[in-house]
Amino acid sequence: MVKEAVLKQYGKSIAECTDREIYDALLTSVNELAAQKESNEGKRKLYYISAEFLIGKLLSNNLINLGLYDEVKAELNAAGRSLAEIEEIEPEPSLGNGGLGRLAACFLDSIASLGLNGDGVGLNYHFGLFKQEFKDNLQYETKNPWIDKKSWLNKTDVSYKVKFGGMEVTSRMYDILVTGYNNRTNKLHLFDIETIDESIVKEGIDFDKAEIKKNLTLFLYPDDSDEAGRLLRVYQQYFMVSNAAQLILKEAKERGCKLTDLHEYVAIQINDTHPSMVIPELIRLLTAEGMSMDAAIKEVTNTCAYTNHTILAEALEKWPIAYLKKAVPQLMPIIKELDKRVRAKFDDEIVYIIDEDDRVHMAHMDIHYGYSVNGVAYLHTEILKDSELNNFYKIYPEKFNNKTNGITFRRWLLHCNAPLADFITSLIGDGYKTDATELKKLEKFVDDEKVLNELLEIKKDAKIELSNYLSETQGIELDENSIFDIQIKRLHEYKRQQMNVLYVIHKYLEIKDGKKPARPITVIFGAKAAPAYVIAKDIIHLILCMQELVNNDPEVSPYLKVVMVKNYNVTKAEKLIPACDISEQISLASKEASGTGNMKFMLNGAVTLGTLDGANVEISQFAGKENEYIFGKTADVVIEHYAKADYVSMDYYEKSDVIKDAVDFIVSDELLAIGNEENLERLYNELLNKDWFMTLLDLEEYIKVKDKAFADYEDRMSWAKKMLHNIANAGFFSSDRTIEEYNKDIWKLS
């Protein structure tokens, strides 16, 4: 295939081509092959609308799904070239931030692989979130241009007029083909405008937020610490849903829809609250077509479904009416009508769409005017029903359902850990590639020492590969015989990276005191903090200070290393996850809706160190609690602390020398000598005077359980059994299973 591709594009042999030319030729050929595959069809079509799609690099993923990966790799190897090196040329699409976007990407893969008729709809961000740089142990943000002249983006002739208050813009739709595993293709539709001006971004990621026609699709989640930034988010969200709604109605009509039967032709999944305005926008468009308000509302309610991803109040969006009047005045009469109908039916002001502060609650609109509300892990859904959305659950119990998240095994095993995938195939065949529950067959090898030793060797090889990568990219040398303890996820206080770095401080102090671990420990972090999230950036500062302090201390560094991976993204996750021994999933119980990193680590043979939060609950049920390290207060206890407002972090600090020593070290002379006093003191005071996510509540138990995990690691056969149990029981967490459940219970696509 490669020979023909480069000959067709450049008239050269493989040997005569640069890696860049080979990459460009493969991109063109793979795009053409994907376009030739039949599209998924059916009367009813799903539109998965999301502000984020963290899709990762696509070359190898598409080659795997098209059944060409082994052929291309072998052909390049025979010519003395490397597919891995060629893939390094590919920029990672910067279209997402964290779990929300990665989940959407996994879902698109599974929707296509299962042969379902469903496309993604989002925005074509030119600079994405941001590129993370470190200087003076602080995070700095720069723009992240990822769109090459040749890319997976296919410009279409589809465009729509989108009206805002006082102006109109014309969109342009770009498509990325979504290849199914040995199946048909779907599309990811990304909308943009051609008046975008990348040159308005000056220092870092600063730009004029009021220049909507120039900035609308520059960044994902523009800084919302001021009114201009918040307004820009409203403009972005409406631009996304207006295009989506126009596309949906156009395609539905082409399939024979009369609009009065829209729900028979269309299912819309609202992924978190960012696309919520699709509800009033569709009602607006349907009434403009002559439908009555009653009929339009009924049709939209039977078409839209909502996925809730969080119980954090900050993430349940509420937009001031003043913003909506300015940006999208045409929606306000409809939103007011929707709220009026809710008020006529219910006395409980908690369920109103417009609150007493004149803010529009997006989630409330989704619940009232959608036919399904789902959480993303068993515990999360139960918390929604029992407390956070209990008032709505009492009204609409039939709407609420759980869909535990999943991951695509094609990317997170076949692609990122081929040696492990090949080993599994040699043991149980390749049926697990399309039916992940077949991994359960691995359990019959749990006492086979030859298999267990091979599993340990595969893990060690992955650690060597990661060590080489970090040495080349960040100049940090790691010991592959050390324990790789990894926490990679969006930086947020509820995810408690601060607790992990307090453990690092504790271990540093122990080593300085002469108490050395039996085996060296490598603690690896990867995380970006939102530009305006001050405490999150302070936590990164502390991690970077500890990295400098620990790694340069000859007394400590042989036993402990700290690594903060710069500009963490999907590509780096693909290198980190296969090498992980201990997966850090330490969010405050009740706060993590699900998590999917926990599933990726499990599939790749890491053992979970975690709280009973999100999908950790189900992971420990499937793999067995004896094969994980569970600690911390339960969700019930945490929720009670919040209800009574009786958690005082200072109490825990004062009664424990272990906690006191670790926290005090944040403002010690050693750290202040290399860190920024303002950042460190602010974090220190936050932990002692607020600690909203209860770090100190669980810290002592975390230290004890983590030390036990490190001690247990020394029994290599016992540890390998834990690894095997995790891999064998990961099948439930395939996104194919999740999507089958969505389709059976919510979408009902043929």
PLM features: residue spans?
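A conserved ligand/cofactor-binding region detector
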Residues: 1-750
